[in-house]
């Protein structure tokens, strides 16, 4: 993933309509508060050799995606060595263990001055990838596109298991890891009991530090979800709950950020639709939710913020999460929240003032939580929720914490 400035320098575009906003916040927090020389290396499409460009405050290295970063790619090791020799870093901060380029750096340059920030953990996520779907449902909904690309929900889950092996190897090799939840702490130490765990919260994109949700300005009975891209986001399960909610609130509306995986209105939808999209179509039709679900397409930070403030409720129905930034963003703005009780999410919702939590499997409980929250939202006092979130995502505080971690590791 390229940060906005890096993308602009490479191809003239700068919108960030994907995950990774925490890295923008972390970089700006460090640069705004400390005199440091910062470089960021990312894989990029459309190039066939290593490229270096200088931004206003950051040096960027673009590594060709080549054969891809979901498998061991020996080319990455030589690129990492070249970058390391050119920039001569005091410390290398690897963001995320989901892809192979972090392991490539450690293999090429060693682990003595490297630290990993845990984002999600594919080695753990893999078992939850298709959670809530039966084998027969998955097989029955294999599409033409799945057959052509030889990529089904089962193979996607298998891909998580394979990438998880590289993640485990990386964590076993490292001496330091940065996390922020009891879940990533437990799973990091389960892999490497000798690794030193450093706690540091994440800084969000600047757009979410201003404005506050107001009941009088929201669209009543409207739910916002940040993604339905993959089964791991749990949208297939949420649809079951929405079917129950609709009996009580007929005008319930669910708006979803990200690409429309159903491709129901796409002229070539039949040939391009993934199996998961077909499953969602099947459920939407089964529960007669065609007029209750709206896919918004990819959104940048300002557009996401608009949808949070517009919604009556934010729901995170994932099968597994560590600390979803979408929950943090919603809380920062004071939006009523419901999330599944999974992974590290419970650390983000310590009390009912900050949101409600429901087990992923409890479809009826989720439906009742949605109905009750919508009915009670007129009287919702979001001051505690906002206060807790702003303390957690305080940019200055998190920059100081991260800088001190860097100094501790270097010394």
Can you annotate each of these PLM segments?
Residues 1-47, 56-58, 397-400, 407:
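N-terminal subdomain of nucleotide-sugar transferases
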